[in-house]
């Protein structure tokens, strides 16, 4: 499936990779980000990726977005209770494929508009986190350098942390002295990030755990807002998000 860019004429100097939530779609994510897109339209193009697995509608999607299906998710649900399903590495390979194809399509058609950051919502925010971490670890040579990220109501599973720990420990099997110090530092992402957390979000506890475990306190900003599992909708909250993200982009040198 080819990438889906902002429908308006491409004219911004840089682009952001947009990774929607579970049971969602690029069309829905475009609507969810409409206020942010409007504020940043002169600065960024928004490049949307479609998740690999067809699924039912996710939380909060129906009935509002009943006409914007079909819906997709990043991780295929499994009823296997014997733990014989695909490993995290195998599932990430399925996640990487549509993202890589989207990036290649964008770079081919818009070689002078680099992708410099990412926006992820819910399950897409967890995917974004894993992409950022894998890139920091020297993997994913096909992924453009991610300099900034906005994570909206991240969904979290401890399985992701365990995967990261296992990958790090592979490099420290013979280094006992570093197991309690250096290797833990390798689990922390060190790029400017803004984390939006709805106070009434069912995923709030996991969102807090994700930023505490895997993002540098010096680089990560957390903004709580009055709301549930959604992009903020109160005007003052929206303005705060826009202002903070702009400043973050300046810090990351993705915005002048």
Curated annotation (Swiss-Prot):
Belongs to the LovG family. This is Dihydromonacolin L-[lovastatin nonaketide synthase] thioesterase. The gene is lovG. Lovastatin acts as a hypolipidemic agent that works as inhibitor of (3S)-hydroxymethylglutaryl-coenzyme A (HMG-CoA) reductase (HMGR) which reduces HMG-CoA to mevalonate and is the key step in cholesterol biosynthesis. Lovastatin, simvastatin and related compounds are widely used to treat hypercholesteremia and reduce the risk of cardiovascular disease. Furthermore, statins such as lovastatin were found to be anticancer agents. The active site is at residues 122, 201, 229. The keyword DNA-binding does not apply. GO terms for biological process: lovastatin biosynthetic process. Pathway: Polyketide biosynthesis; lovastatin biosynthesis. It catalyses: dihydromonacolin L-[lovastatin nonaketide synthase] + H2O = holo-[lovastatin nonaketide synthase] + dihydromonacolin L carboxylate + H(+). Esterase; part of the gene cluster that mediates the biosynthesis of lovastatin (also known as mevinolin, mevacor or monacolin K), a hypolipidemic inhibitor of (3S)-hydroxymethylglutaryl-coenzyme A (HMG-CoA) reductase (HMGR). The first step in the biosynthesis of lovastatin is the production of dihydromonacolin L acid by the lovastatin nonaketide synthase lovB and the trans-acting enoyl reductase lovC via condensation of one acetyl-CoA unit and 8 malonyl-CoA units. Dihydromonacolin L acid is released from lovB by the thioesterase lovG. The keyword Hydrolase applies. It comes from the Eukaryota. It holds the Pfam family FSH1.
